[in-house]
C-alpha cells in the first residue's frame, strides 16, 4: 500500500514537473519570438522622427525625437526649448532659451538608455516580457552611477510600433509617449551635428 501511494505521488510530481517544463519552454519561446520582433523592428527603422509627450513629477513636456546614423536628437519644444544630440561616447545639451551649451558623456546618464535601446544589440538579452491583448512590453533593470533604473518599453502589437518608454528611479517615474511616428523622414544630417550652435 505504501509503495502504491509512493508511486502515485512520484507520478504526480513527474507530471507536474513535465507540465511546468512545457509552460516554461512556451514562455521562453514567446520571449525569444518577441525579442526577434523587436530586433527586426529596430533594424528596419534606423531612421525615423516622432513627437513625444514626457510626463515626470506631475509636469508635462512636449518635444520631437529624431534617429539616424547612430545618433539621436531630442528636442523639447514646450514649455522650455532644449536640444540634446547624442552619440555613443559624446552628447550635447543646448538650452535655446538660456543660450547655454554643455557637452557630456552619455554613458553615465539616462541618455545611455535611449542610445542602447536603439543601437546596442545586447540590450534585449535580459528583458522580462509582459504580453497583453493589444500590446506587449518588456522590463529591464539598468544600473547608472550606482542607481537602479527600471525600464518599461511598450509596443503596440499589430502592426508593431513603439508606443511608450517608462523609466523609474529614485526621482520617480518619467514616461515618454511616442506620437505621430514617421519612418521615412529623410532627415538632414546637419541636425545631428555636435558642433556648438552658438558659434554658427
Regions found by a protein language model. Give the residues of each.
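Bacterial N-terminal signal peptides that target proteins for export
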Residues: 2-13
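A short, Trp-centered hydrophobic/proline-enriched beta-strand micro-motif
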Residues: 40-60
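Short hydrophobic/aromatic-rich beta-strand segments that constitute the beta-sheet cores
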Residues: 50-52, 72-76, 91-94, 138, ...
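Short, solvent-exposed helix-to-loop capping segments enriched in aromatics
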Residues: 109-122
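An acidic-aromatic
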Residues: 64-112, 174
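Gly/Pro-enriched, hydrophobic low-complexity segments
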Residues: 122-200
